[in-house]
Amino acid sequence: MTTPVSLSQVEKKTIESILTNKKEEGKLITKVTILNEKKKKLEIKTLILSSNRIFLFTDSKGKLSAEHHYLEITEIASQSENDVTIKFKNQNVMKMNLDASEVLKTLYGTLMSTFPGIKIGKTIIFNITPASRIPSIFQATSFKDIQGCGSFNLTYRSVCDHLGVQPLSSILWDIENLYPFNQVREFNLAEIYQYSFTDLKAILLSLSYNTYFQSFQSNGKLSNEDLNLLAEVFKENSSLQQLTITNSQASKEPIITLLQNVAENKALHLSHINLNNNSLENKGILTLGSSIQTFSNGLTYLNIENTSCSGKGLEAMFGCLTANNVVCGSMTHLNISNNKLESYGTNGLCKFLSKATALQQLLMSNTSPVYSFLKTSSSSIQTLDFSGNKSTTTKESVIDILSFFKQMSHLQTVNLSRIQTTPDDLKLLFSPATSLLKCSSVDLSENDLGDGGIIKLCEIMYPNSNLHHLSIDGNFKTKSKLRARAIEALINLIDDNTSIESLSLASGSGKYQLKGDLMPLLLSLLKNQSLVKLDISGNGVGDSGALAVSKILWKNQTLKSLKCDGNDFSYTALKMIKCSIRRNEKSLTILQLPLSDISTILKNDSNGSSHEKILKTIQDIQTSIVINYPNNIHPIDTSSGGLTPTKQPSIGSLAGVIKKPPIGPPSTPTKSSNPGFQTLPKRPTRGPLYPGRATGGAVTLTDKAQINASTIELPPLVSRSIDLLMEQGISSVGIFRTCASATALKKIKTRFEAGEDIDLKAENVDVDTVAGVLKSYFRELPNPIFPENLHEYFFQAMRQSSNEEIIQSLKDIIDQLSPLECKMIKKLFHLLHLISLEKDVNMMSPENIAICWAPTFFRSFASELLPINSFMIVNYFDIFDPENKPISSDNSGDADTDSTQSTCTTNNNNLVATSLSSPISPSTTPTKSIDNVLHTTVEVSRSPNHERAHTVGPMTSKRPISNNNGVSSNTPPLPNNVTPHHNTMPSRPSASPIKRPPSMGGSLSNFAGIPLSNHSSSGQLNNNNSNNNTTSNSSNSSSGKSSSNPSPIPTPPDSPSMSYIGDGKSTLRSKRFSRVNRVSYSPVLPRAWTNESRTVSSLFQDDLDSNSDSSGPSL
């Protein structure tokens, strides 16, 4: 007791007895003078201020005269230093003469320490005059009595004392021991065990007068009376920021009252509201919207899923949200699922989305939107749940919502399950016109795609290097003849698209089981090094499937999470899984027990003899997984404050520190700022071979100028591959379009990724395989060479009026790349340029090369990018290497041609005429004597820089000509009046014509100075009408020489054979080519090529009908 007061023994004994019975502790005791209203006289009494109540005792015997709880006080007034008046809710008034300053300080300090959330000036009024006394009373008050959890235990005890209720010991223990341990500020009614209505009333009233908790959650049944009590909480409380009331099963009226109190309480700042599964109807939704419209601090989370509201109610709510600019700029999560949008709600949603600049998650499943009204969206949306939204009318189609998806430029996760889409609709949805191809998580469950649809889906998803999770549950409704191809397409997809980390193939709600059809996919995971999470629940694969799973778990070190319930596993299957996990210390870390299968096993064991064995096996599986955790923990840098090497993380946090084994050389581990609180890890970047894009900021031109290009080393895979292709692959027919051996390609890639520097030439690796490895490298880069943010700059560059301006604009774009990227693409485009110059031989014009490489460079299949890529290939030297651009000569308009050049041209004409006029059978080739004449008669001027064919640039070698029958011979460059017949390979049409620069005109006289080659290939020449006579006369003088040696030169085994048709046209017979969709690595075609697997839609093939009248290469 702070103030000593002399009391008689009788008074002291009586007061201590009363305080002990009431479990009160006195804070202040003093003598006061009180006016007795009945007796109209002053009486001296003893005043005691305890922790919860005010006591008055008589001065003589210590008899209790009056007591009042602090929560009964309505006003405390003091007009001078010697008087205090206290008013109570029951209209009682206590007027006292005493030292007012000490009493007021004790009253205020006790109130604020016991009820930190009580509103001074509203709940209790302090009326103190003069005002100069207020600072000395309030500011000098100490709050040392405030305990852990904001003194919530004191508040709860005091409220229980006020209501006459015994406090729940479980709540007091939790408040004193659990909540302070990890700073939990979420009050969840589900954590309170067995409470009555009065207990709930005491708890909620305590929340009203305390400021510790910031979140209130209730997920269960609440009566109307309970909700009315909760409404009073939100009328008084000023600290709660999150409100969650779900599945209350109450009427809408008490919830409406609660929302009205929220709007009236200006001290309350809710940022999170979750009212799902409550019957709010339109009236409740409108009240909610009106309340949110009054918010001044914004709202980040709103969930009104399944609240029985119609389109008009939603339209009214969206109107209120749109009217509050603060809410539009702060809301990040909106869930309106299982409500009917209809036309009114769809319009309101679009208006809100047009202003919702911060919205990241939009969940609108089963809302029946009108497709044609979905015109506006938000570019900030990252997660979209559009599941269950079928078209409302037969006239609506996916085309109506393309603009809705197109505006979501940052979309990462999309759920399109149960929308009954078709494969053709999927092609539209995942076209470059939308942003869905950028999504890392795609859910297409229960769309009844069937086997054919799965094949189409794999083809669509194949180029998506951003895809990490794919869910196709319940799509195998009916088995067809395409089932094997569908499974193989999935295998190829997850094998080739190494970004896919999670795959879900569960049976879905329709229970469409794959059974034995799933076996090839399971066995393919033995060597898979990218998949981290797999779900095959409900497919009924049986013990044979369990055997495949056990082999996977035994060998695979990447797969960390597996769901396999509902597969008819027996006790033997459980034992196999147990043994495989034990034998692989880097096996699973998350395995959901197959409870339904275990239940079936136990039911079938009627005698119960195997129950103990089954239980022991399950325990061994769990123990093995726990033992495997330390082997899957990513090393943590102890300097960053992480776990020490000897400290073992708790089981609850171990799932967040899983790391996949790296592919290739190990990279330096990065520091983790928050270890133990991550989800499944991302696939690591594939070592130094995959540099990706620099993350340290853009490299300025000044920085580039200071970097010596000779100090930048290209990845061995790139440099070795390009060097070999320059030397051996420039004239290879169909280079980059020809299908390479998938096995050989993977072997080469694996060796390079392991850090081995392979001598491709010494090992005699096929050029098609090297081309496939090179293209695969650029396709698998974490970021494309030309990212999406540069695409618009490319389009603007191509709109320039002249070639010079276009070239300069493209050079400016190239300068924005990192030095390593600049060096890589410079060397790669040099190769492509050289290949394009041999288009008459290799049938790869710049347009055809662009079809192969544009999707890889730009990571897009937009046809508008093809002419850009083609232009860069043709104008390589102008864009990438203007210093070494060869000097081309044009003799067609020069009257003073030098005699040597004139002699060369004349000889060329004579030789061409000779070869064209000589009747040679298709089985023969030019004689050796002609080859000698070509080498001895024609003199070609070389540039000093032209030492090797692959370093010459546009002045490359190996340009053959052929006679009318398609037989080729090595010749020097042709004069101006002879034009070659260009490659007739079919190619994708460009969006706009490409202007050929002057150095690449139709006249072949520009190619004077190229070195000769001994390599023979196929080609064709069509002479202009203007030089027919000259050619004919020249042929008479050399016809004898051309036929002196009729013996044919054998064709090398590796060179393609040519089939000749009556009109002299030739077609390729030995090679097959892929289309723009990269079908050379397509997941939808078998790896072993057969006649059954060759289709017009996937191959440029040559199956010609012997009776057909063809004029060129045909499909």
Curated annotation (Swiss-Prot):
One of its GO terms (cellular component) is phagocytic cup. It comes from the Eukaryota. PROSITE patterns: RHOGAP. The record marks R737 as: Arginine finger. It is found in: Cytoplasm. InterPro entries: CARMIL_PH, Leu-rich_rpt, LRR_dom_sf, PH-like_dom_sf, PP1-Reg/Actin-Interact_Protein, Rho_GTPase_activation_prot, RhoGAP_dom. Keywords: Cytoplasm, GTPase activation. Residues 934-943, 959-990 have a biased composition (Polar residues). Residues 898-929, 1013-1046 have a biased composition (Low complexity). Residues 699-880 form the Rho-GAP domain. Pfam families: Carm_PH, LRR_6, RhoGAP. GO terms for biological process: cell migration; regulation of actin cytoskeleton organization; regulation of aggregation involved in sorocarp development; regulation of Arp2/3 complex-mediated actin nucleation; regulation of cell migration; regulation of phagocytosis; signal transduction. This is Rho GTPase-activating protein gacW. The lineage of its organism: Eukaryota, Amoebozoa, Evosea, Eumycetozoa, Dictyostelia. The gene is gacW.
